[in-house]
Amino acid sequence: RQRIQTFIPTALYLGLFSLMSLFGLGLISAGYDPKFAIEAPVLPWVGILSPWLMFAAFFFLIAANVPGWTRYRVQHPMTLGISLWALTHLAVNPDLHAWLMFGCFFVLVVASALTASGRQKNNPKPAPRWIFDGLTLGLASGLTFCVYTFHGALFGVELS
């Protein structure tokens, strides 16, 4: 990664990395086939709580990128958000594809959390402001609504 960043600017590297990640997520979604069901335990109460768990996941994902108090107080909000997202999906999906995809996301985010101290950047954090926490609440609410409304169109899996 550092070798690549000597040839191209950091912003371009991050943009290309993000595009490749989105492309990979699109390929995962396109390759989904519901006929590969396994006998995995489904926790019905998680289905009832899933809108709230996903709201929390979106909140922490957004909070990781804005200078609010959540980012200031929670050590790794993005790790927490991805963990909530992956575990919620694991708890409600009994098919092999979901277990492989969300299980891998969870394993990778746990590995990232365990190795995070070695990658700590010494960039000063901007002063936290409450306005960004309010903005995060609004964005997470809107994103939760949109994902729940359009989940079938976006990801090919209808929510029951």
Where do the model's predicted regions map?
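Membrane-anchoring alpha-helices and their flanking helix-loop junctions
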Residues: 1-75, 80-160
